Structure formats: structure tokens, C-alpha cells
Amino acid sequence: MADYLISGGTSYVPDDGLTAQQLFNCGDGLTYNDFLILPGYIDFTADQVDLTSALTKKITLKTPLVSSPMDTVTEAGMAIAMALTGGIGFIHHNCTPEFQANEVRKVKKYEQGFITDPVVLSPKDRVRDVFEAKARHGFCGIPITDTGRMGSRLVGIISSRDIDFLKEEEHDRFLEEIMTKREDLVVAPAGITLKEANEILQRSKKGKLPIVNENDELVAIIARTDLKKNRDYPLASKDAKKQLLCGAAIGTHEDDKYRLDLLALAGVDVVVLDSSQGNSIFQINMIKYMKEKYPNLQVIGGNVVTAAQAKNLIDAGVDALRVGMGCGSICITQEVLACGRPQATAVYKVSEYARRFGVPVIADGGIQNVGHIAKALALGASTVMMGSLLAATTEAPGEYFFSDGIRLKKYRGMGSLDAMDKHLSSQNRYFSEADKIKVAQGVSGAVQDKGSIHKFVPYLIAGIQHSCQDIGAKSLTQVRAMMYSGELKFEKRTSSAQVEGGVHSLHSYEKRLF
């Protein structure tokens, strides 16, 4: 036993593992499966880990999760769910500009503090107009003013309780006959704070609280449903007006300037320039145009995988970079064009360069599980963009179908011929709009049902927090600081180590993640 003893106590600890710099300066292209993070010291619980992350220079999220602008991943339903759970969704642009802008508008109107542009009707409108508004907007608590517009005298409100039991032949009745009159309403004065208004709404037990000025003219309204959403989703991503954050994608062509104008009018918070290879004169010119016309709009450039690519977009003025080329589950760019880079190496190299200029990095692609998210964040990414991981959730576009008894949803790459045939925007992303023969850079497939975002994303959040706990970091900021200082250590995995790290040596098993 004495042969194993070393004098001098336990003060000596051998150097173990590789720093990120040592790991990625070996010349090999590494994916997330090619390495592990070595554990640290735990003196806190997982729920104490702060996942606050920068999406762009000016937008911060409470969770580092972003949904990809793909037509089988993100429309309004996904963007709303992502924002409510602390992330953000980017509405795809493989559609008309009008459709995309309307999807953004749905997100911005979903949860609000002071609603300054609500649906308003007049006393001479009819009951059928309320039902039409309910079908179009999903609610029927509608204020009634003299002229049917904001800024005119409030005379009443119409709610579901006023119309629920009306027969169809009564749908031509004027609203003034059945509305709740002004004298029966609880209102609040203009200038009141949101907190004070919410307290009045809670005490009144009403569904809506109109805000009026000294002339009794309607200037805003607050909804009880928004109070409930605030309670149920404390991490929700919101702007200064308490509206949900929403992003959208555009291309780099001249006609995308019209799309940009519609998105700006709809209230979009951040725009990503959607290109498979972002280091182009087209993207640089578009960045400069956007920054000049909409200086307060945050712009994400990409995709890039090298520091040289990143430099040109940073010089042009981007507020964040999207990193990844050919690493997505439905992407075949590396196979077809022989261009791209393994994702772990790309994220580390670009993040290490971009951080010097205060430009956050979004790791886009190659994410197969929550461990990959943790690794991307540990390599310098501020947020992680997900496509296949969120496809087939309830909130993703498309209908479920069954194959061999398994519930599936369609999922396709924006470089697939299927997506290119749907709309020109997908062709533009891959510089294929003028080609007589299309070269597919993606495939179409199907993904198994994952349930709702409202259950799946909390699982991802908990997984990231537990990963940070094992690392010994109380925040993602600390994780990155440990990585750049060399305190955080990594280790390469052989193919045998990867087998050992997965489920093995069982006759059968059930893998339930949450």
C-alpha cells in the first residue's frame, strides 16, 4: 500500500484534459460528438444556474434557445411558444412577404401590456361583426367607441357574455342594443402604470380594462388573459412595450427590401439574413442598407464558419452572427458542394474571433440533443438555433401523419427541391434562382412527434442547467469565461468512447427523455 503513497498531502493535482485552444488547434474538424467537457466542482443547485444570453448586441434572452427560420419549423405558433418560454422564433421567408409580415403581427399582438391598437367597433356595427372579429383574431372582448376607432369616446364594450346565447337570426342586431354600457365599465386613467392597471384589473374581476383620457376617449386597453400569461411564463421574451419578441428571415435580393419594409411595419424585433454562405457582396450591401434605413433594427448575418467570413460581416455592421454550413440533419451541402465545416470547430473559431468585437454567435445546425446545446454554449456560442430538434412539436407548421404506427410530421431542408419548388426565397438562399438545373443542398424527411414546446423546452432548459452545474458554473457567462481562460477542460472521444457513452449492453430498453 505504501508504494502508492506520495508525500506532501493532496496539494498536487496533475494537469488533466485539454483547453479549448488545444482541442481545436489540432487541425482536425470536430463535431459535438468528438469530445466531452470534463466536470468541475459543485456548490450550488441546478435551478440556480442563470441562462441569460445575448441574442444580438442589444437583445438579451432568458434562455439561449432559438427556432430556425424553416417552413416546417417556425411560423407564428412556434414563435409565440419560443418567446413565452424565454427564447425567440424566426419566421421563415419561404412565403409571400404579406404572409410573413402577418405571422410577425400575430406574435406581436399575442401578449401585450398596454394594447394601443386593439380591434374597435362602433355602436352601429352588428353582432355578426363581432363573430367575424373573433374568428379572425381569436377573441371578442372588443371596446365600442363613437366612431369605431381609437381616440374617440368610449361608449361600451362587447364580450362573449353579451353574445354567447344569441340565436343566428339575432346576428344583425346593432351592438348598442346588447353591449355593456359605459356606466357599467371599470376604466383606468391615461398615464397609469402597468402595475397599477393590472391591480385594478385583478380587483375588478373583468376581462378587459379600458384606458381613457380626460375626455373619456379610448387610448389603450389591458387584457386579463395577459395577466395569466405573465404568471404562467415568467421567462417570456418581451420588448419595451411588453410585447413578445419576434424575429424573421429575409434574403439578400432587391425584392427583399419590400419584404423588410412590411416586417418593420409589423413590428419585427430582429431580422436574420438567410443565406447558406453569408460572406457575399449581396449580404454586405443588404446589411449596410438595413443599418441605414432601420438603424434600431437588429441584424443577424450569416451563415459563416470561418473568422475570415465573420470579419467581412462584422465590418459591415451585423449585430450577431449565425454559424453553421452543411451540418444540419437535412442538409447535404458538404456532400454536394464540398464546402462547409464540422460544427464544433466552426462555433469555436468564429466565437473566439467575434467576441473581440462584442458580436454574439448563434450556433445553427448539428444539434441532436441537449448535450449538444451545452457543448455549443461552452464553445462560445451565446444562443443555439434548432431545426430538427423542434420539428414535429405541436407548434411546428404542418399536419401529423402516421407511418408504421408512429406519429410523424414532415421536416425538410430549405435547400431541398421540395422547398425550392414552393417559393423562390428558398432558391435565393442557395443562389439557385437563375439555375436551369437545381442542385439540391437538402432533403425532405419526417420527424417523430415530440409533443408541445411548453413541455419540451423546459426539459432542454433543465438539461442545460444541470450541465452547467456539473461543469461548476453558475451561469453561461461563467462557462464561456472558464473556457477562454483555460479553466474549462475538454477531452477527445474515440469511436469506442462514443459507444461507451451511449446506451449499450442491453437486450432492450425504453428511452424516455422527459
UniProtKB/Swiss-Prot annotation:
Its cofactor is K(+). SUPFAM superfamilies: Inosine monophosphate dehydrogenase (IMPDH). The modification Phosphoserine is found at S122, S160, S416. Acetylated by CLOCK in a circadian manner. Pathway: Purine metabolism; XMP biosynthesis via de novo pathway; XMP from IMP: step 1/1. The modification N6-acetyllysine is found at K511. InterPro entries: Aldolase_TIM, CBS_dom, IMP_DH, IMP_DH/GMP_Rdtase_CS, IMP_DH_GMPRt. The modification Phosphotyrosine is found at Y400. One of its GO terms (cellular component) is cytoplasm. IMP binds at S329, D364, G365, G366, G387, S388, Y411, R412, G413, M414, G415, Q441. GO terms for molecular function: IMP dehydrogenase activity; metal ion binding; nucleotide binding. Belongs to the IMPDH/GMPR family. Catalyzes the conversion of inosine 5'-phosphate (IMP) to xanthosine 5'-phosphate (XMP), the first committed and rate-limiting step in the de novo synthesis of guanine nucleotides, and therefore plays an important role in the regulation of cell growth. Could also have a single-stranded nucleic acid-binding activity and could play a role in RNA and/or DNA metabolism. It may also have a role in the development of malignancy and the growth progression of some tumors. Homotetramer. Interacts with CLOCK; in a circadian manner. Interacts with ANKRD9; leading to its ubiquitination and degradation by the proteasome. This is Inosine-5'-monophosphate dehydrogenase 2. It comes from Cricetulus griseus. The lineage of its organism: Eukaryota, Metazoa, Chordata, Craniata, Vertebrata. The gene is IMPDH2.
